[in-house]
Amino acid sequence: MSDWNPSLYLHFAAERSRPAVELLARVPLENIKYVADLGCGPGNSTALLHQRWPAARITGIDSSPAMIAEARSALPDCQFVEADIRNWQPEQALDLIFANASLQWLPDHYELFPHLVSLLNPQGVLAVQMPDNWLEPTHVLMREVAWEQNYPDRGREPLAGVHAYYDILSEAGCEVDIWRTTYYHQMPSHQAIIDWVTATGLRPWLQDLTESEQQLFLTRYHQMLEEQYPLQENEQILLAFPRLFIVARRTE
């Protein structure tokens, strides 16, 4: 599991794209020239940006070669760069930085977010959506299984929190719109939940394990999911998935 799997990621493309659509709807910009899609993945969010601003120069950034290859194939009119978000520098100041479900993987948001704001033009916008599920059973159980099986903690850190992000971005010279939404995804089985998180949150826990260790981990994880996520009357499972949204407009 050394690289991301675009096919597995896109298995839930509609569910993953919905937050990007809702984030984009709150971006208060019309005619813009320069856009960056940070953590663009296979290009599903980039496609939304290109649809809204077809004349803009849109650059997708991702550290995964597989994701970049998929995005280039899907969107030949956009530019894609394989790079670390923290180190990438645009050729010119940006009108919009869009980051859908990517910045949660990076540390030290107290430095990262002001840095991203510094890359914007005056009145430019930083639009961010991050999964806020560190305390959800899906992610708590990852840590519990790892502890049971004596594996090191590979999970990401929790988000800084609504009040912290508001202060960080206000102090960086932005007007801030921030909100939190919990989606309830209908899942056909507990295995479907595993398929979902295997493409994202579960990757760090599995990537250094042998095949047999991965199987032991997933078997125990499946057992725990069954205990935490009961079936509905129609035998579907409701997967709660909170997400944090931020639209920050530079005023300085």
Curated annotation (Swiss-Prot):
E.C. no: 2.1.1.144
Gene Ontology MF terms: trans-aconitate 2-methyltransferase activity
A Pfam family it matches: Methyltransf_25
Any one of the GO CC terms: cytoplasm
Family matches, as SUPFAM superfamilies: S-adenosyl-L-methionine-dependent methyltransferases
CDD domains on file: AdoMet_MTases
Chief place of localization: cytoplasm
Entry similarity comment: Belongs to the methyltransferase superfamily. Tam family.
PANTHER family attached to this UniProt entry: TRANS-ACONITATE 2-METHYLTRANSFERASE, TRANS-ACONITATE 2-METHYLTRANSFERASE-RELATED
Enzyme class: transferase
UniProt-recorded name of the protein: Trans-aconitate 2-methyltransferase
HAMAP family: Tran_acon_Me_trans (MF_00560)
Listed GO biological process terms: methylation
Function: Catalyzes the S-adenosylmethionine monomethyl esterification of trans-aconitate.
Keyword S-adenosyl-L-methionine on entry: yes
Methyltransferase among keywords: yes
Keywords recorded for this protein, A-Z: Cytoplasm, Methyltransferase, S-adenosyl-L-methionine, Transferase
